[in-house]
Amino acid sequence: MATLVGLRDGSVDVREWTGPPRPGPAVLFARQNLPLILENGQLNPNLSDGSLWGATLGNAIRVWRSGIGVDARGDLLYAAADNQTAESLALILQRAGALRAMELDINSEWVTFNFYGAPGASEPSKLLPDMTRETTRYLEPDDRDFFAVFSRSGG
C-alpha cells in the first residue's frame, strides 16, 4: 500500500509499505492510501482501472484529485487539480520530478490544502481558490484525517 512516511529525523518519503504493522521507533507517522501511482518514476500500469482509485461523486471519471510524491533529492511534491483522472494526476507529479507518488483525496468535497500562519498573512488561505472547503476546516472537529507540514526553523 502506498504510504507517506514521516521520520523522526524530519525527513519524509512516499513508498510502498512492505514492513510489519509496527513500523519501529524511526517512524513518526504513516498515512496510507491505495497503490502507488508512480514508482521509480514510472506510471502504475493499472491507472486506467477506475475502480482502484476511489469512488467519485456521480461516478465521474474526471474529478478533483490530489497527490503527493518525492523527488530524487527527497523533496516533497504536492499536486491538486480539478478535472483529473488517476493517470493525469500521476503524469503531473511525474513531470514535476516525482520518483514515487500516491493519490491522496479525491472529489471537490475532500481535496483541501490550506496555509496557516504564512508570513504576512492575516488569516488562513487556500492553495487554490476553487477548493470548496473553508480554510477553518481543520481548526474545528472534522470527519476526515489530515496531516500538516511545517517549515524547519533556522533553515
Go through each PLM region and give its residues.
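Gly/Ser/Thr/Pro-rich low-complexity, intrinsically disordered segments
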Residues: 1-155
